[in-house]
């Protein structure tokens, strides 16, 4: 893993010592080279090549998320160029350095071998994200959004620390690799049920579970483009990754404790999808659609079957790329129209036809059109939940229908209709923006053709 972490850290001095006109080019090109090198390193024929270290390792669960994390840094830097045009040179450098440090923390989080180390890095990702949201957000509400984001995630994860320290004392080790070999089953007592709640709450807030999701639309709407991209694509996946890892520790209690959370997720999935149908703010709509998709992932993880885990992994990766792409498209609209209200951005298809094509593809992947990887993830989850309980098919089917409705509503509102008078003099699409869309869609296309890249050789 150091082959990824050290070059990424070295990007920070590269940015600070670059000539003013070369900052963006250097940061983008070198981060893209690092991500491509990491992809080739992670694509090893045997599992043991990266597992020599006792601190960092990669396995079938963390590798897809590591790939997504490294791939996203050049895309965030590409997307942020216009947003930071009028900023001073030092602020541009600080911004890029924060993105790079966030990437380092995320790579280390996904490859940590030990729970306490994972927890420390899990919390460390908050700091750069919070600075990015509160300093470079668009409106003054960003401070309120930052406060929500910080307090929800911190309050959720404090009980986790206490639970981890207790488990460390009782088990002797919290190493992921050792825990798989230890057969200590936890009894379903009151105290152990509370411990399960303490362990899961941090990840359920991060996912977020319906009811604990209020920080997410605020943070997404107020964050700058890179903040929205990293929040949607990776930070929500930290919750899913942590839940999958911690179910090893809490194996028998999860079956006993999962019912209320499964029902809340299934209900929340319908509710947040329905909320999307009456949104006027474009970024808010995409944020609520993220909550709806993540509810599916929570259901899959709590069911705990191999199929549901495969579905959760596939949907997390697919959603990461799709939601990031949608935020980029929303940002390209915002840069031209200076408003996130969908009614003001109508009729853009006649002015920007290529951008309308990207919107169409993004909306179709969001509603899980065959043969995309989104559909594969959703199908695996629907089948796993159906085998758990036949009644879930009603809620899942309703959710699929509403997802299609709000995706098409978003597409038709922004692209169709007669354009408003203030959109006459907007700038055409840049090559940078089109490259950004292609770099989002290329991995989605690749995964749709060959899902075994992330689902393993068993698929």
UniProtKB/Swiss-Prot annotation:
It holds the Pfam family Proton_antipo_M. GO terms for cellular component: mitochondrial inner membrane; respiratory chain complex I. It catalyses: a ubiquinone + NADH + 5 H(+)(in) = a ubiquinol + NAD(+) + 4 H(+)(out). The chain crosses the membrane at residues 22-42, 60-80, 92-112, 113-133, 147-167, 196-216, 224-244, 257-277, 284-303, 308-330, 351-371, 375-395, 439-459. The keyword Secreted does not apply. Its main location: mitochondrion. It is a multi-pass membrane protein. It is found in: Mitochondrion inner membrane. One of its GO terms (molecular function) is NADH dehydrogenase (ubiquinone) activity. InterPro entries: NADH4_N (IPR000260), NADH_Q_OxRdtase_chainM/4 (IPR010227), NADH_UbQ_OxRdtase (IPR003918), ND/Mrp_TM (IPR001750). The keyword Translocase applies. Its EC number is 7.1.1.2. GO terms for biological process: electron transport coupled proton transport; mitochondrial electron transport, NADH to ubiquinone; mitochondrial respiratory chain complex I assembly. Keywords: Electron transport, Membrane, Mitochondrion, Mitochondrion inner membrane, NAD, Respiratory chain, Translocase, Transmembrane, Transmembrane helix, Transport, Ubiquinone. NCBIfam families: NDH_I_M. Belongs to the complex I subunit 4 family. Core subunit of the mitochondrial membrane respiratory chain NADH dehydrogenase (Complex I) which catalyzes electron transfer from NADH through the respiratory chain, using ubiquinone as an electron acceptor. Essential for the catalytic activity and assembly of complex I. Core subunit of respiratory chain NADH dehydrogenase (Complex I) which is composed of 45 different subunits. This is NADH-ubiquinone oxidoreductase chain 4. The lineage of its organism: Eukaryota, Metazoa, Chordata, Craniata, Vertebrata.
């Amino acid at each position: 893993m150091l082959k990824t972490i050290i070059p990424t850290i070295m990007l920070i001095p590269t940015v600070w010592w670059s000539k003013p006109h070369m900052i963006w080019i250097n940061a983008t090109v070198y981060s893209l080279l690092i991500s491509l090198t990491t992809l080739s390193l992670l694509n090893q024929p045997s599992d043991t090549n990266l597992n020599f270290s006792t601190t960092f390792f990669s396995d079938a669960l963390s590798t897809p998320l590591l790939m997504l994390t490294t791939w996203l840094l050049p895309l965030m830097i590409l997307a942020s160029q216009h947003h930071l045009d009028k900023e001073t040179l030092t602020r541009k450098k600080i911004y890029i350095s924060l993105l790079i440090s966030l990437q380092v923390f995320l790579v280390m989080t996904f490859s940590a071998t030990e729970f306490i180390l994972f927890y420390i890095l899990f919390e460390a990702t908050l700091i750069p994200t919070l600075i990015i949201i509160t300093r470079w957000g668009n409106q003054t509400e960003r401070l309120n959004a930052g406060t929500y984001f910080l307090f929800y995630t911190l309050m959720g994860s404090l009980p986790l620390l206490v639970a981890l320290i207790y488990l460390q004392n009782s088990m002797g080790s919290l190493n992921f690799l050792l825990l798989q070999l230890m057969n200590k089953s936890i009894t379903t007592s009151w105290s152990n049920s509370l411990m399960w709640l303490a362990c899961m709450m941090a990840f359920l807030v991060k996912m977020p579970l319906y009811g604990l999701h209020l920080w997410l639309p605020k943070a997404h709407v107020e964050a700058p483009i890179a903040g929205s991209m990293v929040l949607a694509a990776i930070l929500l996946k930290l919750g899913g990754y942590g839940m999958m890892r911690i179910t090893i520790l809490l194996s028998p209690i999860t079956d006993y404790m999962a019912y209320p959370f499964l029902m809340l997720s299934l209900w929340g999935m319908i509710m947040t999808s329905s909320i999307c149908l009456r949104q006027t703010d474009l970024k808010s709509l995409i944020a609520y659609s993220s909550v709806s998709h993540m509810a599916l992932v929570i259901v899959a993880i709590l069911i705990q079957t191999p199929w549901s885990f495969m579905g959760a992994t596939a949907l997390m990766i697919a959603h990461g790329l799709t939601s990031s792409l949608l935020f980029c498209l929303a940002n390209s609209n915002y840069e031209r129209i200076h408003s996130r209200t969908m009614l003001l951005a109508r009729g853009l298809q006649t002015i920007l036809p290529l951008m309308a094509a990207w919107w169409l593809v993004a909306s179709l992947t969001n509603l899980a059109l065959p043969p995309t990887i989104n559909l594969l993830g959703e199908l695996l989850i629907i089948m796993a939940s159906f085998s758990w309980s036949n009644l879930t098919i009603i809620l899942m089917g309703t959710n699929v229908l509403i997802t299609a409705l709000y995706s098409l509503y978003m597409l038709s509102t922004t692209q169709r209709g007669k354009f408003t008078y203030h959109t006459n003099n907007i700038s055409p699409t840049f090559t940078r923006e089109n490259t950004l869309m292609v770099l989002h869609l290329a991995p989605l296309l690749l995964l749709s053709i060959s899902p075994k890249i992330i689902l393993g050789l068993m698929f």
